Amino acid sequence: MAKYFGTDGVRGVANKELTPELAFKLGRYGGYVLAHNEGEKHPKVLVGRDTRVSGEMLESALIAGLISIGAEVMRLGVISTPGVAYLTREMEADLGVMISASHNPVPDNGIKFFGSDGFKLSDDQEQEIEHLLDQDNPDLPRPVGEDIVHYSDYFEGAQKYISYLKSTVDVDLAGMKIALDGAHGSTSSLAPFLFGDLEADTVTIGCNPNGYNINQEVGSTHPESLAKVVVESECDFGLAFDGDGDRLIAIDEKGNIVDGDQIMFIIGQAMSKNQELNNNMIVSTVMSNLGFYKALENEGIQSNKTKVGDRYVVEEMRRGNYNLGGEQSGHIVLMDYNTTGDGLLTGVQLASIIKMTGKSLSQLTSQMKKYPQSLVNVRVTDKYRVEENIDVQEIMTKVEVEMNGEGRILVRPSGTEPLVRVMVEAATDEDAQRYANTIAEVVQDKMGLDN
């Protein structure tokens, strides 16, 4: 069976790998699996997209596929991924679909599905869609005549989502000057409206999409652009979103980057003090910084680690009924309010904490000391054998003894490439780089492609 779904939906180069033909089939078969086979004759489906030039092409094909199976489609236009997830639940739709490749460059695009509960698909649901794609089954329902349903536009959905985000905080942001970076993507209009409605004074970059400039030297993957603006414009802080609005990276008033670990710590600390943190637990991935875990320990907050990927964070949060989790990359999940990472929601919550505490962002982050981190990738013949390689395990043990508790080692196979990733955190940059290179040399010697 072909594998279409990755860790975050179906992705590829638009019109080459992710073609209109494939988008049509994803609409048809995805609509059947996730809505039509629930017994609904005309399942209600919401469709949103980011600002990529290929979005309208794929949107048209996807909607045609959905209508061909009998779906009633509401087109949301340009909106964030978490906006689609929220509206799918709020409007009691049977299915939500987002067309986006998130932080990827403009040639890429993707299609991801949300169930009626607002959560991404299970592995079983993805496999069922893939099975139908392989079969290309001609026997699925094909409504005709009066059974074919019109699609409609519901661009007001974005304002409904903004109104909801405003309702999640009890303070306005009057007197605060905030720099916003929309990555020329889904939040380009949403972010200025949201923070403007909350009475903040805003300075914006990355909010002029033209279909071709999404994520181009702006957004959460290029926070240095916003850092410069924050300092030059004397802002209180800055918020950088990614192309589809499910990530947030912040900038403090001094121009320092504040990553997902630091944001989780600040929000988790506030929630814990207000007795709002379920089981006093934060869910993160194995890539979170050692300083994050030490800071949580100092606050008496527990932590739980998952594999890399926000879907694994969400799975663990649902399993344990936890309400805060996320990744260093800026995917922050606040389960009390939404079912997926939400950059705008996270930004509003962070701004609210800054306003209520009266502390600057640099003061709030100072309570978490980040350990310098070094990452080395090694191309290998069989990445999955790294955990059983005796020489690699021995050098890891030796380095751990030398670090004496002031560091951390993570050696793991890449999820997408024939690589072993060696990550070391240590007390200094020099130590982190030296230890990472030492381990990587052994991985290369014993497992590398050249050997």
Curated annotation (Swiss-Prot):
One GO term of the biological process aspect: peptidoglycan biosynthetic process
Principal EC category: isomerase
UniProt PTM: Activated by phosphorylation.
Enzyme nomenclature, EC number: 5.4.2.10
Gene Ontology molecular-function annotations: magnesium ion binding; phosphoglucosamine mutase activity; phosphomannomutase activity
GO cellular component, one term: cytosol
Catalytic reaction list: alpha-D-glucosamine 1-phosphate = D-glucosamine 6-phosphate
CDD domains in the cross-refs: GlmM
One family name in Pfam for this protein: PGM_PMM_III
Listed InterPro entries: A-D-PHexomutase_a/b/a-I, A-D-PHexomutase_a/b/a-I/II/III, A-D-PHexomutase_a/b/a-II, A-D-PHexomutase_a/b/a-III, A-D-PHexomutase_C, A-D-PHexomutase_C_sf, A-D-PHexomutase_CS, Alpha-D-phosphohexomutase_SF
Cofactor stoichiometry and binding remark: Binds 1 Mg(2+) ion per subunit.
Keyword field: Isomerase, Magnesium, Metal-binding, Phosphoprotein
Enzyme active site: S102
Keyword Hydrolase assigned: no
Modified sites of kind Phosphoserine: S102
Required cofactor names: Mg(2+)
Presence of keyword Oxidoreductase: no
Ligand binding (Mg(2+)): S102, D242, D244, D246
Family the entry assigns: Belongs to the phosphohexose mutase family.
Role of this protein: Catalyzes the conversion of glucosamine-6-phosphate to glucosamine-1-phosphate.
Designated name of the protein: Phosphoglucosamine mutase
Encoding gene, per UniProt annotation: glmM
